[in-house]
Amino acid sequence: MQIVASYFSTKSLTYLAGTTAHKGEVEGWLLGTRGDWKRKIPACTQCHGDRGVGIGRRFPRLEGQQAAYIRSQIHAWRIGTRHDDPLGLMRNVANRLDRRQIKEVSWYFSELPKVSKMAGGGSVGSVRGFVDSRGKFIPPANDVLPPGPFGRVVRLGENIFIHTSSYAHRYSGNALSCENCHIDAGRLANSAPMWAAYVMYPAYRRKSGQVNTFAQRLQDCFRYSLNGTAPTRRSKVLLALESYSYFLANGAPTGRNLSGRGYPSLESPLHGMSYTRGRLVFRNYCSVCHGKDGQGRLTSSGRQGFPPLWGKSSFNWGAGMANIEVVARFIKANMPLGLGGTLTPQQAWDVAKFVDSHERPQDPRFNGSVSSTRAKYHDNPLSMYGKRVNGLRLGDPLDR
C-alpha cells in the first residue's frame, strides 16, 4: 500500500479533487470498487451499483451518505441489530471487515461524488504472480499495474472486463460483463480465472473442432456469452483483453492445469434435477439480486446492476452457461455472491436446471431447424435447447 500511495501522489490521476491520496483513501477505493476476495468480501459496488448509487430497497444508495452513518450501519450488521438481510451477506461482510477498513470504505463513499473517478487505480509494483507453498498460483495484486504503455493497455483490458457493455459496446450484445462469470475481474480461483485459462492455450476445443488460440477463445465469449460480435484479431478490445489476461498469468507455469481453473467439479445430484425445486431455490436465494423475473436489477441511474439470467439481454443458447452442469458448478462455488459454497450440490443442480429452462437469444450456429441444431450442437441431457418447458419448445422462434 505504501507504493500505491506514493504512486498517486506523483501522478496527475488524482484520487481526490485537489488532494493526493494516502494509504487509507486508496484502500477505501479498493474495497468499495474491487472488494477483497481473499476474505470473501465482494466490492460494495457489485451490490450497490456503480459508485454506490443504489439498486432498489435492498441495496440502498451509499454515494454521499455521511461516513458516520455508513459506519453505524455496518456496526449494526455486525452486532445483529439490523436484520433486513435475507441471505446474511451484509452480516458476513461486516464481520470480515476490520475497524480500519470500515472507516476507509465509509469515508470513500461519503466523499462521492466529490471524489474524482480514478482513471488509473493501480500502482507500479510487483507485476508477477507466484506459486505459493501449497502449490497454488497467486496472481498479481489488484492494486498494481505494469509501467508505461503496456500498463495502460492492461488497465483498458481490466475496464473492458468489468464494464464490458461500456468499454466494448461495439461488440457486446447484452447486459452482461466478463466479470459476471469470472468473479473478481478474472482473478478469483474456482470462478474460471483468466490466469488459469491463459496458460492453457493454444488448445484443441471440442466446441470448435479445432485448435484455438486464446484470442479465438475470447472471440467466442463475445459471440456466445455476450451475444454479440467477435472483435477482429487486430482490434484494441481483443488486444487489451489478451494483455490483461497475460498480466494476470505472469509468473504462472505454462501448460499446467492450475488449481482453481474453471469451476470445481460437482457430484451428480442424488435426486435428479427438478425445475420445481429449482424455482424454490431461485426464489429463496437468487431473486433478491436477480429479480423474481430473472432479469436482474437496474441501478438508480438506470444502468444494469445485477445481470439478467435469461431473456433477450442474457447469454445465448451457444454459451457455456447454457449447459446445466456448467451453471451448477459455478453456482455451487460462487453463489450467492460472497456466500459461495453455502448451497448444497442438490440445490445447485436444481436451480441450474431452472435457470436454463428459460428462453434466451438464439444460438448463432442455428441452421433454421431447432431439431437439427440440437442434434448437431446440443445433443446431451444437460442442454435444454429444443426441449419443451411449460408447453413451449426452447429455442424455437415459432414458440416465442
Model regions: which residues?
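Gly/Gly-Pro-rich "capping" loops immediately C-terminal to redox-active cysteine motifs
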Residues: 1, 40, 45, 49-79, ...
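Post-cleavage N-terminal segment of exported redox proteins
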Residues: 1-34, 73-84, 96-102, 106-158, ...
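Sequence/structural segment immediately N-terminal to covalent heme-attachment motifs in c-type
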Residues: 21-53, 149-185, 269-306, 324
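Secretory-pathway/luminal and periplasmic proteins that interact with or process carbohydrate-rich
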Residues: 38, 53, 99, 167-170, ...
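Substrate-binding/catalytic groove segments of enzymes
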Residues: 39, 81-85, 188, 227-229, ...
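Protein kinase-like catalytic domain
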Residues: 48, 78, 113, 161-162, ...
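CBM-like carbohydrate-recognition segments
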Residues: 82, 172, 366-400
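A contiguous, mid-protein "functional segment" used to position or interact
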Residues: 344-379
